[in-house]
Amino acid sequence: NLLNKFSDAILNTQWKSIGWFFCLWCLILLICLLGYFWAFWRIYSGIEMLSIWEFIYNPFASVVGLFLISVFLPVPDKHTESAVMSEHFMAKCKPFYVTLALLWLQFGIAPMFVGFEQSPLEVAFAWLMIVVSTSGIFLKSFEGHKFVLVAFASCYLGQEVIQLAISS
């Protein structure tokens, strides 16, 4: 679904004016998806047995959340005029940001249920991602949404760089 949104963003938007915004959201969410599956092995590698409730709350809820984010990401279709693409995003972005914030909250809490300890920097970045995601709910200007996108991408990529440095 996210790949379909990405291809729609590439095909249906003008890159210079607004297309980069939708494409960057799709790209950073694809990177988050890959990051989740990469982290999954790190978190669950030592687990021999999960109860059904641990499975539902941890990996299953994460995958459902990632899917819902891809559904709620308001990428315009080919029938949306380029002049109203920003209004299209602003009118439909609240479910996307709520789901994104809830997913990061779940990502921050879930490792504790299986006894996985995160570094203080990982925890701090997880809370920062929640704040950045939640702030998108309250914005009234498209410029603010651009800032949230850049802040979200910077925080996520910064978190990944720090995790890479810690593991090296």
Model region roles, listed by residue range:
Residues 1-8:
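N-terminal signal-anchor/start-transfer transmembrane helix
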Residues 8-21, 45-50, 78-90, 138-148:
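Membrane-interface helix-boundary motifs at transmembrane edges
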Residues 103-109, 127-136, 155-156:
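Hydrophobic, membrane-inserted alpha-helices
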Residues 158-168:
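Juxtamembrane boundary at the C-terminal end of a transmembrane helix
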Residues 58-126:
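Membrane-proximal helix-loop-helix units in multi-pass membrane proteins
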Residues 44-54, 110-123, 142, 166-168:
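Membrane-helix interface and helix-disruption motif detector
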Residues 20-43:
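A generic, lipid-embedded transmembrane alpha helix
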Residues 24-25, 146-158:
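Central hydrophobic cores of alpha-helical transmembrane segments
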